[in-house]
Amino acid sequence: MNSIWEQAEALSPQIIAQRRDLHKFPETGWTEFRTACIVIKKLRQLGYIVHFGADVIDGSAMMGVPSEVSLRKYMQRALNEGADAELVEKMQGGKTGIVAVLDSGKVGKTIAFRF
């Protein structure tokens, strides 16, 4: 495979399967525990240094956070759907944000993408 298009085409079935899986288990804002676990594991697998939970989210700046009772319900739902218990526990209070760092070893600018 030479071109990026050929590489993307080869990954297409995996990407489609992942998208369909995520759509089977929709999660609203501050309750994306299952999705965050999937993203964290994939980023680590790809070699990123991953920070999440209270390390990257300022709880005092969060708006529209569900009640603690609701958050507990969504955390349990994520666990029932296969989320990693250790990761979910670190996202207490709906702190489902993730920051991934890829150190290229080269001097230069830092680029951030937010999704």
Predicted regions and their residues:
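Acidic/His- and Gly-rich active-site-bordering loop/insert found
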Residues: 2-115
